[in-house]
């Protein structure tokens, strides 16, 4: 039986055997995999995402972040057939249904990658035109949107384990925020494989994309005002 792993702190973690939860094929009820997040230091994982992943993303321009997303899309798409089969087993869907999820994930990542290219080589997104704030143009201001210094925590639903992770991660990464994604345990087999293909392709900096398979435990206790 496959043991599903979390990916945090630049490493894979299989959890503690005594706390495993079983995943079953919804059609046959056969066990597919076991999962646990017990033993993971979530405080350290969050700090690592902020300091390593966040710093790496903020150093990149919008266009460069877009290139990361396109690379993620291609990495996942290369395993499309495998992921479709996995989706049918893990989610109990038809092949046609599974295509919505897998192709939705790669299509969304690619689209946000293209948006990054359109935004160009800057690091700040201007918010409207500038305004003269005094009698002369010497006192002038303009709002700009910059990356937050925290991490984006995504708790996802069971029905789109690939697309759900991808559409949230794409927006956050383009905005310069590292991601820790937590798929629904019942269908996290698909998400784990998606993340695994990205890690194997080595297409994003360490700390940018994290995965929790299993319980979030005390994760929320370690968040602060810059996290979302």
Spans of features found by a protein language model:
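N-terminal Rossmann-like NAD(P)+-binding subdomain of aldehyde/semialdehyde dehydrogenases
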Residues: 1-134
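Rossmann-like NAD(P) dinucleotide-binding subdomain of oxidoreductase/dehydrogenase enzymes
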Residues: 120-228
């Amino acid at each position: 039986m496959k043991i599903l792993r979390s990916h945090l702190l630049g490493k894979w973690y299989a959890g503690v055997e005594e706390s495993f939860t079983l995943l079953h094929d919804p059609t046959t009820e056969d066990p597919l995999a076991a999962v646990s997040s017990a033993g993971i230091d979530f405080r350290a994982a969050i700090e690592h995402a902020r300091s390593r992943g966040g710093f790496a993303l903020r150093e990149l321009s919008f266009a460069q972040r877009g290139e990361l997303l396109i690379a993620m899309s291609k990495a996942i798409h290369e395993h499309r057939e495998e992921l479709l089969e996995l989706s049918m087993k893990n989610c109990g869907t038809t092949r046609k249904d599974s295509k919505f999820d897998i192709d939705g994930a790669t299509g969304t990542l690619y689209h946000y990658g293209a948006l990054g290219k359109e935004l160009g080589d800057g690091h700040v997104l201007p918010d409207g035109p500038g305004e003269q704030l005094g009698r002369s143009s010497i006192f002038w201001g303009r709002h700009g949107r910059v990356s937050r210094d925290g991490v984006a925590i995504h708790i996802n639903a069971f029905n789109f384990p690939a697309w759900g992770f991808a559409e949230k991660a794409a927006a956050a990464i383009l905005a310069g925020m590292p991601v820790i994604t937590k798929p629904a345990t019942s269908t996290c087999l698909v998400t784990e494989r998606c993340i695994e293909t990205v890690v194997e392709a080595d297409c994003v900096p360490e700390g940018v994309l994290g995965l929790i398979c299993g319980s979030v435990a005390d994760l929320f206790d370690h968040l602060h005002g810059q996290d979302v």
